[in-house]
């Protein structure tokens, strides 16, 4: 665990654990299958994604703030990590350069529509498309450390527009919810059209 005022860096700890696993394998004291399985997990993209999200969520809190605030940040980071480990679509950190060209994606949803905020479209040839880290159907969880969960659409738009240099997004892939949302919006549009005729 990091000392007070020190950022959480789990990568070093994971590397050390892998070194110790390799040493234990060479000793022959433990069946190699179990050690190799654990080593594969620690070296997996999944574990790396969980680590990134944990560190990112933990970093959003001011280190000099109260113990309660730090504990809350640690709890949120732990929940994100456990959600990922239980097979839920795990959150990922995506960093995009912010240029005059924009970010190359559209969002939909928000509190006023009683839905999460989603990436509804990746613009072909745009920054997000060229980067490849975002997918249509990604739920937007935070923008540069500011949570947009349960927020109005406009807040997410403002945060995205205000970003300079780079924008750091935390997203989670949940395409079924996006499909349900789009279907609901299409039904609402159809009902409006019928009322107008």
UniProtKB/Swiss-Prot annotation:
Q: What InterPro entries has UniProt attached to this entry?
A: L27_C, L27_dom, L27_dom_sf, LIN7, MAM_complex_regulator, PDZ, PDZ_sf
Alphabetically sorted, this entry's keywords are: Acetylation, Cell junction, Cell membrane, Exocytosis, Membrane, Postsynaptic cell membrane, Protein transport, Synapse, Tight junction, Transport
Q: Does the keyword Cell membrane apply?
A: yes
Which residues are the signal sequence here? none
Subcellular location(s): the record lists:
Cell membrane; Basolateral cell membrane; Cell junction; Postsynaptic density membrane
Q: Which residues are recorded as modified (N-acetylalanine)?
A: 2
GO-annotated molecular function: cytoskeletal protein binding; L27 domain binding; PDZ domain binding; protein domain specific binding; protein-macromolecule adaptor activity
- Does this UniProt record's set of keywords contain Plastid? no
What range(s) does the L27 domain occupy?
10-65
Q: Name one GO biological process term.
A: synaptic vesicle transport
What Gene3D superfamilies does the record point to?
2.30.42.10, L27 domain (1.10.287.650)
Output the SMART domains linked to this UniProt entry.
L27, PDZ
What is its quaternary makeup? Forms a complex with CASK and APBA1 or CASKIN1. Component of the brain-specific heterotrimeric complex (LIN-10-LIN-2-LIN-7 complex) composed of at least APBA1, CASK, and LIN7, which associates with the motor protein KIF17 to transport vesicles along microtubules. Can also interact with other modular proteins containing protein-protein interaction domains like PALS1, PALS2, MPP7, DLG1, DLG2 and DLG3 through its L27 domain. Interacts with DLG4 and GRIN2B as well as CDH1 and CTNNB1, the channels KCNJ12/Kir2.2, KCNJ4/Kir2.3 and probably KCNJ2/Kir2.1 and SLC6A12/BGT-1 via its PDZ domain.
What does the UniProt entry state concerning the protein's domains?
The kinase interacting site is required for proper delivery of ERBB2 to the basolateral membrane. The PDZ domain regulates endocytosis and recycling of the receptor at the membrane.
Q: Which family does it belong to?
A: Belongs to the lin-7 family.
> What is the designated name of this protein?
Protein lin-7 homolog C
> Where does this protein come from, organism-wise?
Homo sapiens
**Organism lineage:** Eukaryota, Metazoa, Chordata, Craniata, Vertebrata
Please name the gene that encodes this protein.
LIN7C
């Amino acid at each position: 665990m990091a000392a007070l005022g020190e950022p959480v860096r789990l990568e070093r700890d994971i590397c050390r654990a892998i070194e110790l696993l390799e040493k234990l394998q060479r000793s022959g004291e433990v069946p190699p299958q179990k050690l190799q399985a654990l080593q594969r997990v620690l070296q997996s993209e999944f574990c790396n994604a969980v680590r990134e999200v944990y560190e990112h969520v933990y970093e959003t809190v001011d280190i000099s703030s109260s113990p309660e605030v730090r504990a809350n940040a640690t709890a949120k980071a732990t929940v994100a990590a456990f959600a990922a480990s239980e097979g839920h679509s795990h959150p990922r950190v995506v960093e995009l350069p912010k240029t005059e060209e924009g970010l190359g994606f559209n969002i939909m949803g928000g509190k006023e529509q009683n839905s999460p905020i989603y990436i509804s479209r990746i613009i072909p040839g745009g920054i997000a498309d060229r980067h490849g880290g975002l997918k249509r159907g990604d739920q937007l969880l935070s923008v540069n450390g500011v949570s947009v969960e349960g927020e109005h659409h406009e807040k997410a738009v403002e945060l995205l527009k205000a970003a300079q240099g780079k924008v750091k997004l935390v997203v989670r892939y949940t395409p079924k919810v996006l499909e349900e949302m789009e279907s609901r919006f299409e039904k609402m549009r159809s009902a409006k059209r019928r009322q107008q005729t």
